[in-house]
Amino acid sequence: MTPNPMTNDLPDPAAAPDSAPLYSPARVRALLAAHGLKPTKSLGQNFLIDGNILRAIAEAGGAAPGENVLEIGPGLGVLTREVASRGARVTALEKDERLRPVLAETLAGLDVNVIWGDALDFDYAALPAGTRVIANLPYYITGLLLTRFMQAPGVVSATVLVQKEVAQRLVAQPGQDNYGFLSAVAALYGSVKHVRDVPKGAFFPAPDVTSSVVRLDFDRTRPQPDPAFVSFVDNALRYRRKTLRNNLRMMGHSGEAIDAALSDLGLRPDVRAEDVPLSGLRAVAAALGVVR
């Protein structure tokens, strides 16, 4: 994806619309109507219009003046403005080219570089060290994007608005109802904190689900997780309510090898995959020769 700054699109800084924040459905409708636009459901365009929540997200993101921030899907630019106005250098990835004139208007005078294209095509590995992600993520690609953030060595944190169900999975611990692969892989890379829930009415148009803000902090002093172990965890937790033994059998391991590994590690033969902590899964993987 080639950077495409909006410098030539932006009006004079004095024209930045500070006096008319987009904090109501009426304001959003008026702005969209002025440009002949409507929200596109297929792109997950539910625009956040609650000023208190926007400020809370920016605050939780923790970007200091001069730090690099990456935003996915700036939409109308309201969160972008909140973060950039605090002195951060914001790069925003936007897929919907129809929003060019809108962002030219709402981001006037701010230190923001908009890159036009699909966020799934962006080279996250090239981000500078210390980059923080602060974004209202498109819900239909949340999992893919979270994985990209985790794997990008320059990204130190991601403060993101996601579906509440996804947030519950991210913060879940082994043995809890929502624990699964996403919970485990997030723990492999660092830690997750629930910031706050966000009601449907904070968006225009309102989504079908409740949302939550979470912050993921990535410990870049750790070595990158072994891909073989990540794949093992994925398969082990794919049917998390089944016994770990059954899941391992579906992975192609022999019953004898599995029984020996579980016995040696003090794990019950009927233990469920969701009840085994990462350290236990790593020990099982080592016993089965998946990792060293």
Swiss-Prot record:
Its EC number is 2.1.1.182. Coiled coil: none annotated. One of its GO terms (molecular function) is RNA binding. It comes from the Bacteria. SMART domains: rADc. The keyword rRNA processing applies. Keywords: Cytoplasm, Methyltransferase, RNA-binding, rRNA processing, S-adenosyl-L-methionine, Transferase. The keyword Cytoplasm applies. It catalyses: adenosine(1518)/adenosine(1519) in 16S rRNA + 4 S-adenosyl-L-methionine = N(6)-dimethyladenosine(1518)/N(6)-dimethyladenosine(1519) in 16S rRNA + 4 S-adenosyl-L-homocysteine + 4 H(+). S-adenosyl-L-methionine binds at residues 46, 48, 73, 94, 118, 136. One of its GO terms (cellular component) is cytosol. Pfam families: RrnaAD. Belongs to the class I-like SAM-binding methyltransferase superfamily. rRNA adenine N(6)-methyltransferase family. RsmA subfamily. Specifically dimethylates two adjacent adenosines (A1518 and A1519) in the loop of a conserved hairpin near the 3'-end of 16S rRNA in the 30S particle. May play a critical role in biogenesis of 30S subunits. This is Ribosomal RNA small subunit methyltransferase A. It comes from Deinococcus radiodurans (strain ATCC 13939 / DSM 20539 / JCM 16871 / CCUG 27074 / LMG 4051 / NBRC 15346 / NCIMB 9279 / VKM B-1422 / R1).
